[in-house]
Amino acid sequence: MAGAAPGLVPVIKGNGYGYGLSRLAQESADLGVDTIAVGTAREVSEVREQFPGDIVILHPWEASSDVARELAADDRVITTVSRADDLARISELVSRPRVLIEVLTSMQRHGLRPDDLDRVPTLLERLRVEGWTIHLPLLADGRYAEAERLARAALEAVPAPLWFSHLPPEEASALARQLGGAEGDPVPVRLRMGTRLWLGDESARATMATVLDVHPIRRGERAGYRQRVCPADGWIVVMAGGTSHGIGMEAPTSATTLRQRAIAMATGSLGAAGLALSPYTINGKKRWFLEPPHMLSSLIFLPRKEKPPAVGDELPVELRLTTATVDEIVTS
């Protein structure tokens, strides 16, 4: 992956994709890249000791942020600017700051509109423009055409490297050649990559949880904070992992296909009935929560016919790693 991406810029933000910011900064240093990208200005301090190169701040510059203003003067930091007025303002506050200028895409999140691009050349003497940044949506339909259209508009205003998010390496390389012309050199392109780089190969990792306790329980008995009535004879398996680890934390579904909508409807109906499938696998099957997860542990119901796990066993648990906080990372 690292070798295929032109000008790879690893993205290290938020919870570090489950691994932590400092660990991914060190991994990036080991990859030999010259630049990484963090999400916010405050994340710079968590990675700069582990990574010796340049650090891009993805969140647009805010004049009201003391940290952002201070870092704009740091020669190792490249600040993203998404408004024309902020380009003028940052150039007044800081002597020739290093900036990436964001172009508004169909995501409609941040960026200069096409009719603002002609304001950039008037500020060039007061800025060090490291490139144009184009953050594309995830959908493949129309992605390449949008990238080409915006890139051409940006390059017409100021020739500079193009930094892309969510553009496959092969498309980025093809676009660089296309923009360079039949006889010209490819336009310099850099690819930011986060989820695909750190979480792309699911076979390279496993998330496990420890069995903390096991209790027999009979139908009609109550258990848990909410004193839920047990639906049948079975076992209460107390598993490590709760809301503080990301258990039970789920992003809203996009539900773009009929299958996804059907799953969302079924899940909602079960939730309304007080039933929620847990991410824990016991004896080869995901099992039901007895009640919503606690902060550090979860109560799982296992039917009596099943053999219960032993205290201390480690069992698979499915986690959304972008919202997870794990207790330990073991490298094998």
Give short role names for the model-derived ranges:
Residues 6-157, 161:
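Active-site-proximal beta-alpha core segment in soluble small-molecule metabolic enzymes
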